[in-house]
């Protein structure tokens, strides 16, 4: 059995990656490369991964898919910054029954999310699984996950040991 016999459209996958390469010429390999940041005495890398879960249902209702890409980046980056790390880069994972324009819309959001977070998208994976999931009429079969890495000076890690009753909590919102 080959890819075509299993229902995987290699040409659609290659076209999808080509569209992404127009915006990100460095992607497309089997890994993402990122230079080690300078200016740290004892740098610690911090990583976080997350998925969008049932938020996909909101996209289905409104037929708007770019916002879920922004949200995916934000959730991963938010996990990384909780310890004081500066986010550096992001990788995405899309699993779907069929590569469709929905995937392009999601990636537009991922790119926007990376721009808003001030980080680079250095790679990812788009997996087409036609025998395991129906085509994405409304994205029913789409699963999204992301992974982000940041860096923090070892002596500046926020780990909660110094949080005390009465401390002020600040909340910021970007409008």
Regions found by a protein language model. Give the residues of each.
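A glycine-rich phosphate/pyrophosphate-binding beta-strand-loop-alpha-helix module
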Residues: 63-143
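N-terminal amphipathic/basic leader segments beginning at the initiator methionine
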Residues: 1-26
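Conserved small/polar residues in nucleotide/adenosyl-binding loops
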Residues: 173-175
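Short, structured beta-strand/loop micro-motifs enriched in basic residues and often containing a Trp
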Residues: 147-154
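N-terminal small/glycine-rich loop or linker at the start of catalytic domains
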Residues: 42-62
């Amino acid at each position: 059995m080959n890819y075509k016999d299993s229902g995987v459209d290699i040409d659609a996958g290659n076209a999808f990656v080509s569209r992404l390469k127009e915006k990100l010429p460095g992607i497309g390999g089997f890994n993402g490369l990122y230079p080690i940041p300078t200016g740290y005495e004892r740098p610690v890398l911090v990583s976080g991964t997350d998925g969008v879960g049932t938020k996909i249902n909101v996209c289905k209702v409104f037929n708007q898919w770019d916002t879920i890409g922004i949200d995916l980046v934000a959730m991963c980056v938010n996990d990384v910054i909780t310890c004081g790390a500066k986010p550096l880069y992001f990788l995405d994972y899309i699993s779907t029954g069929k590569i469709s324009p929905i995937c392009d819309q999601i990636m537009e959001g991922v790119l926007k999310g990376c721009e808003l977070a001030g980080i680079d998208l250095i790679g990812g994976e788009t997996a087409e699984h036609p025998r395991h999931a129906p085509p994405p009429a409304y994205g029913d079969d789409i699963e999204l996950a992301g992974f982000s890495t940041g860096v923090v000076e070892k002596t500046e890690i926020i780990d909660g040991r110094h949080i005390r009753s009465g401390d002020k909590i600040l909340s910021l919102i970007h409008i």
